[in-house]
Amino acid sequence: MQDKYTPAAVEATAQQHWESTQAFKVAEDAGKPKYYCLSMFPYPSGKLHMGHVRNYTIGDVLARYHRMRGFNVLQPMGWDAFGMPAENAAIQNNVPPAKWTYANIDYMKTQLKRLGFALDWSRELATCKPDYYRWEQWLFTRLYQKGLIYKKLGTVNWDPVDETVLANEQVIDGRGWRSGALIEKREIPMYYMKITAYADELLEALDTLTGWPEQVKLMQKNWIGRSEGVEVHFPYEVSTIGASGVLKVFTTRADTLMGATYVAVAAEHPLALQAAVNDPELAAFIEECRHGGVAEADLATMEKKGMPTGLRVVHPLTGEHLPVWIANYVLMGYGEGAVMAVPAHDERDFAFATKYRLPIRMVVRSTRDAYTDTVAPWQDAYAEQGRLVNSGKYDGLHFHDAIEAIAAELTAKGLGAKRTQYRLRDWGISRQRYWGCPIPMIHCADCGDVPVPDEQLPVVLPEDVAVTGRGSPLAKMPRFYECDCPKCGKPAKRETDTMDTFVESSWYFLRYASADNGQAMVDERVNYWAPVDQYIGGIEHAILHLLYSRFFTRAMRDEGLVNVSEPFTNLLTQGMVVAETYYRDADGGKKQWINPADVEVERDEKGRIVAAKLTADGAPVVIGGIEKMAKSKNNGVDPQALVDQYGADTARLFIIFAAPPDQQLEWSDSGVEGAYRFLRRVWSFGHAFVSEFRPQLPADRQLDAVQLPEALAAVRREIHVCLRQANYDFGKHQFNTVVSAAMKILNALEKAPRDVAAAHAQVAEEGLDILLRLLAPITPHVAHALWQDCGFTGDVLHASWPEPSEDALRQDEIDLVLQVNGKLRGSLRVAAGASNSAIEALALGSETAQKFMEGKPPRKVVVVPGRLVNIVV
């Protein structure tokens, strides 16, 4: 055995052993409970970052721990490989996205292996490979035939220079992020997944997800946004609109209907377009709205603007004729693209009405009695529920009664009805991009839209493509889009849009169960492994990815592909990795961010940074505070450099010890060095055991607790107390305190008296056995090497999780904290099973208590069994 800890050699040996024995390849086993542990798969961006390392370390600790607990553990890995970054890299580096992506996968796979993760690589998948997306296309055709996928016009952000559609986050101040061109809103044909068909089930099933954080469930609940309300029909004023019809609006506040003073429609609404035909000013305003954002977040912050159309509709209850305005805060994609405006009781309508001097009519007296006849500055109380005023026959009715009465009258008149509406919208999956899964549809002039037949799947994405950033490469590639119609055989055109990359990540966890099956999307093995028992990933995926995965699992269930409804039983959202930032002011008001590795810092007595300078020139830099590790702030730590210097086990140990998994992890170089020192101490103790203690073991290796000297019995007890606490903490995912327990065990072993050599060797052997098994999920390489070197049976990978010994925990005597009037005054040694009355007598008779009681009689004595005794005088 080497006397010094050399991480590179230790880790290479362990990893070679695991690979040669296929240690983590797993199959279904009906005789064992299964544990499917999965961390969200990475986008192959080029290199792992610390967020990746933390995510996968947490998952690996859980997977290895459950393996030691006797579970049949699956922990697979794959690559979320489609997406815009590959296209951007292709433009910058003049390399096809496929080549860039596969090179990144190779490099990152090597990194993951060097970190020692217990991954079943036989199930590896990459979403950009035809053997994966073939089945996505196959399911698309099934859902299309069922009506769960359909086609309609959708509003998008169009960059006229790059000739492409941009995501909302790519539009900056109304301009394309790359071209700088003014963005237009365009309506183009798109495919949608009918997630709204599952809205009720997705909402109601949230209550069954007891293993999910409440915050995530609340975010999904709000996103689905079920609301009970009333659909109100405002008949057209024929004299201004020129035809009969109704304008439909949905409201959750039908009680305020009598306060409606105008209606507002989206710029794309048919009434708006009709009004603009002969009105250039209105047409120009609609064009301006087309350049605005299409996200709700944009509407909340942008200036509210509008124009009157000259059209009018009729109030369904009062007969009053209300003006129709075009407003930039109304979206065509939400509800009917129209709202009834009640300025007195809606803050957004209030701001709009105040700006354009529209009538404001109070019709609700709030419970806080904020009612006045004239509306001054907006008060939150105006939006509250209350009793109706200025509402004719409905005056005096409270909120619920008013809604019921008004809904009943609207229904009777045929001008409305009660309705349930959802904030959730169907999922538009068409993307006018190259690097994605081709949509398996063919457009025929005679037959319309025709799904690609099964025998023609997959529709393979050409990989030898030059991406310029202008237009869709597929739309410029006749060899891709020219085809024959599967129905009539005439020349037709293949769909050139690709799918949203969230589609790939919505079912990959089910594909892992049978990733080797080339004949089916999934097979019966999926019903052994699904659902995922523990899913790990960032809370930024709380809504889209996790909601889409829940939807996909149900869609696949209803196709008879899986037997489960929920994809993930337990969800752990790990905290961010953060680090200090430093910068210098540069030209143009910009900041030049400096990596912490290039900075020398000065700290105060509490360890806080008070000054910093650049190592290269010794001149000061500005301390920017703690931020999430990011390229933009240049405060990242390269995991590869960390592993090269300290080893994977040190990186894993620091990540687990620095913070509980769901909390923010603050990077600390000194913390990394501390983790490395601890592992060197573990190694040194293992070496001492092999060279000094093991030869002193008696022939009969059975540890006799009765014969142990008291001091060694105390050491053994401390070890098992730590183990008991570690077992509890592991169950609570408090891995940092598991490491604390391991450190206490090592401290106890190092300080154990050695005067009775054989007994000491026995305690050392048992303690080291426990320590290595405790560390095996966290620092598996060190545990693997020392387990073998120290002569323990078999492979630590196959060892069971240690359990505390009641024999070791048993105490003849225990020490209690002794207090007088609640203040610590000493300790009191009592028999382990002493009664409360016996403890009281011992406490009152002790010299320490007598001294601090100062001759005063005790009022009462409080005994907390096993912990303390408090004398109150």
UniProtKB/Swiss-Prot annotation:
Q: Which NCBIfam families match?
A: leuS_bact
What's the name of the protein?
Leucine--tRNA ligase
Location of the motif 'HIGH' region: 42-52
Q: What class of enzyme is it?
A: ligase
What keywords sit in the KW lines?
Aminoacyl-tRNA synthetase, ATP-binding, Cytoplasm, Ligase, Nucleotide-binding, Protein biosynthesis
Gene Ontology molecular-function annotations? aminoacyl-tRNA deacylase activity; ATP binding; leucine-tRNA ligase activity
What's the EC number here?
A: 6.1.1.4
Which cellular component terms (GO) are annotated to the entry?
cytosol
